[in-house]
Swiss-Prot record:
It comes from Shewanella frigidimarina (strain NCIMB 400). Part of the 50S ribosomal subunit. Forms a cluster with proteins L3 and L19. In the 70S ribosome, L14 and L19 interact and together make contacts with the 16S rRNA in bridges B5 and B8. Binds to 23S rRNA. Forms part of two intersubunit bridges in the 70S ribosome. One of its GO terms (cellular component) is cytosolic large ribosomal subunit. InterPro entries: Ribosomal_uL14 (IPR000218), Ribosomal_uL14_bac-type (IPR005745), Ribosomal_uL14_CS (IPR019972), Ribosomal_uL14_sf (IPR036853). The gene is rplN. This is Large ribosomal subunit protein uL14. GO terms for molecular function: large ribosomal subunit rRNA binding; structural constituent of ribosome. SMART domains: Ribosomal_L14. Belongs to the universal ribosomal protein uL14 family. Keywords: Ribonucleoprotein, Ribosomal protein, RNA-binding, rRNA-binding.
Length: 122
């Protein structure tokens, strides 16, 4: 459950390390974002000489949350940290690698690239 001002780890090699949610996209007064939702983020911490710089604003998709996601069989998949993958204007990932596991809920037409790059799909 991500809302405005939430900080997230970055799960790709775009160069950003920490980002802060500045808007939850999808609806006029939408408050929370979960796994698979697109948010607008600002880069708060980045590595030197990388594509993403501190202060840059990007779209991102949430790939891991502490709140988790409930499956139809009743099981819940939760993670230790909140994480997102930075996206370009065409909603394609900026990085070429994904770090850490992602969930099956990302397996739709928009995010198949992220699922195929991920080392583990839960």
């Amino acid at each position: 459950m991500i809302q405005m001002q939430s900080t997230l780890d970055v799960a790709c090699n775009s160069g950003a390390r920490r980002v802060q949610c500045i808007k939850v996209l999808g609806g006029s007064h939408r408050r929370y974002a979960g796994i698979g939702d697109i948010i607008k983020v600002s880069v708060k911490e980045a590595i030197p000489r990388a594509k993403a710089k501190k202060g840059d604003v990007y779209n991102a998709v949430v790939v891991r949350t502490k709140k988790g996601v409930r499956r139809p069989d009743g099981s819940v998949i939760r993670f230790d940290r909140n994480a997102a993958v930075l996206l370009n204007a065409n909603l394609a990932p900026i990085g070429t690698r994904i770090f850490g596991p992602v969930t099956r809920e990302l397996r739709n037409d928009k995010f198949m690239k992220i699922v195929s790059l991920a080392p583990e799909v839960l």
